Amino acid sequence: MLSKQIPLGIYEKALPAGECWLKRLTLAKELGFDFVEMSVDETDERLSRLDWSREQRLALVSAVAETGVRVPSMCLSAHRRFPLGSEDDAVRTQGLEIMRKAIQFAQDVGIRVIQLAGYDVYYQQANDETRCRFRDGLKESVDMASRAQVTLAMEIMDYPLMNSISKALGYAHYLNNPWFQLYPDIGNLSAWDNDVQMELQAGIGHIVAVHVKDTKPGVFKNVPFGEGVVDFERCFETLKQSGYCGPYLIEMWSETAENPAAEVAKARDWVKARMASAGLVEAA
């Protein structure tokens, strides 16, 4: 795997739903992916993973060892429901406890990167106080992550607070900690009024992984590849020329589709063709 040009992964929510990780990783391997990104979202079902027993955690580690397909990253979107910027102390405390559990979980199962959602609050009105609480919550979270040697990486969002790499870099400079980095989503980055290529270049040295999806202005999910505004080839070329050698993750939500594997295979082929045009992978 280390000799490949780039590692290519698939988001858990692109694959059939269920809690059997051996099946999920086996399917990902059959589809030609190097890794799967786990989702811990705001649903009780996925949040409960943070309370897995020792045996359940070992089953995930065993599935990785058996298949050779890694689970190196977690998309932690549970903070929509329990935001670090909440003015409700009980909600904010729960958000910090979720962060602590996620970092401990990552340490236990070998996850290296936790992607954070850049919302001070999501279902409430933001203000100066929510942003201040969010910054303080990030500082506390990064302190915990440092002790565990787990990287927290901020996603570029569908939300004005964190809708550019430049804004996320402001937090990186504020925190000034090697365990806080950036995890841009080229779809989200392209849906706003950003100079996308300049933004990607600005993030080099801090980008630990890249989400790959298509978007339209105001539409951040479920846009079929090729039907949105993202200039994939230019993004891939910019990242390559800037020296980025890390993983790319195809982000999809096809777990409830009639045939998720077919949807994923179609998207994989489309993305890899653009990667080949940019010189990231060999043409099929």
Curated annotation (Swiss-Prot):
Known EC number: 5.1.3.22
Reactions catalysed according to its record: L-ribulose 5-phosphate = L-xylulose 5-phosphate
Induction line: Induced by L-ascorbate. Repressed by UlaR.
Xref: InterPro entries: L-Ru-5P_3-Epase, L-Ru-5P_3-Epase_Enterobacteria, Sugar_Epim/Isomerase, Xyl_isomerase-like_sf, Xyl_isomerase-like_TIM-brl
Keyword Isomerase carried by entry: yes
One matching Pfam family: AP_endonuc_2
Pathway(s) of this molecule: Cofactor degradation; L-ascorbate degradation; D-xylulose 5-phosphate from L-ascorbate: step 3/4
Organism domain of life: Bacteria
Function as written in the Swiss-Prot or TrEMBL entry: Catalyzes the isomerization of L-xylulose-5-phosphate to L-ribulose-5-phosphate. Is involved in the anaerobic L-ascorbate utilization.
Assigned protein family: Belongs to the L-ribulose-5-phosphate 3-epimerase family.
Entry protein name: L-ribulose-5-phosphate 3-epimerase UlaE
Organism: Salmonella heidelberg (strain SL476)
